[in-house]
Design a protein with these regions (language model features):
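Alpha-helical transmembrane segments and their immediate juxtamembrane flanks
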Residues: 273-290
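Active-site-proximal alpha-helical
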Residues: 31, 166, 171, 175-179, ...
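Acidic/histidine-rich, surface-exposed loop or edge segments in extracytoplasmic proteins
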Residues: 1-18, 113, 211
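Surface-exposed patches in mature extracellular/periplasmic domains of secreted proteins
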Residues: 34-49, 145-151, 184-190, 242-249
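Surface-exposed intrinsically disordered loops and tails
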Residues: 77-101, 147-158, 208-215, 244-245, ...
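Zinc-dependent metallopeptidase catalytic helix centered on the HExxH motif
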Residues: 88-195
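Zn2+-dependent metallopeptidase catalytic core
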Residues: 11-95, 126, 130-133, 140, ...
Length: 291
């Protein structure tokens, strides 16, 4: 991915307010200013209406075919089997997709922002916007083109494993929360409060007994929370720059595990084993590493 200067393209459903568009762009750019601009990226903001999302998906198809003559209108535009945005009307949330694939010519990042969980009126929406940008940052340091085969598996491996959220989500969440905590007018104890809340998931993680690296999105454990604590632990050990800059700089060339060993001082299994013992302490002790 190239370093791309300038704002991302934003496309919003007709029932999305200008204030939501402005807020999304503002917090996206706070993150890109802090971590570097990567792209090209498009932000698609979904509203609350099935009618407006249908129009948005028509626009998606128009934009895709305009930018890429290889785009498959039959399968990669909204159809009876798949749609890019409809589920967000009911489910909410946000996501990043990487359209860095061998069967298309125009490669880009897609950021989809839903209308709820969190809603644009919540402070969490600001953090989620930055969280999604950190996923762009992560993927921007991986050059493998997705061919639905070996290259796809390599990209997944460099993110911490297919369907394994521990590192990718933990990194995005901690970096976003850390950056938000440093913004003007954010209360001084914000980050400790957030991490205290995430510590409620520690007991269920330890009781469940499944290794952190093996947890999937469907396991009944808040893996995002534990991953966030793991990254806080790593950052405390080696420093923010080593985690965010140096590890990712070597990720593509060395691969996940070798870059992990080089910059964090041990392999991922050993570090997680050490972390699993450390995290058994009282929460007050754990919070001492949080700035």
């Amino acid at each position: 991915w190239a370093n791309v200067k300038g704002p991302p393209m934003i496309y919003a459903a007709s029932d999305v307010s200008q204030s939501t568009i402005d807020k999304t762009l503002k917090w996206y750019q706070i993150a890109s200013s802090a971590w570097g601009e990567f792209g090209p990226a498009e932000i698609w903001i979904v509203g609350n209406s099935k009618e407006t999302v249908s129009d948005l998906e028509d626009l998606w198809c128009d934009i895709r075919t305009e930018k890429d003559t290889k785009w498959n209108k039959e399968w990669d535009c909204a159809n009876e089997y798949w749609s890019p945005f409809t589920r967000y009307v009911d489910d909410g949330g946000a996501a990043v997709s990487t359209y860095y694939r061998d069967y298309i010519d125009y490669h880009f990042f897609l950021v989809t922002m839903g209308p709820k969980y969190p809603s644009p009126e919540e402070d969490d929406y600001k953090v989620v916007t930055m969280h999604e940008y950190f996923h762009i940052y992560q993927h921007a340091h991986i050059s493998n083109i997705d061919d639905e085969g070996s290259s796809s598996a390599i990209r997944d491996e460099k993110m911490g494993g297919a369907d394994k959220p521990w590192f990718a989500e933990g990194g995005a969440e901690y970096m976003a929360q850390l950056l938000y905590s440093r913004q003007p007018n954010v209360r001084s104890n914000y980050l400790k409060e957030i991490m205290d809340r995430k510590a409620y998931s520690i007991g269920e993680y330890l009781d469940y007994g499944k290794p952190l690296k093996d947890l999937t999105y469907s396991d009944p454990v808040q893996t995002y929370d534990i991953g966030t604590w793991l990254v806080a632990y790593i950052v405390d050990k080696v420093g923010e720059e080593t985690f965010r800059v140096n590890f990712y700089k070597d990720l593509d060339g060395l691969g996940f595990e070798e870059s992990f060993k080089k910059h964090f001082g041990m392999g991922s299994d050993q570090l997680i084993s050490e972390f699993d013992e450390w995290i058994k302490q009282p929460v007050d002790e754990l919070l001492k590493i949080i700035p």
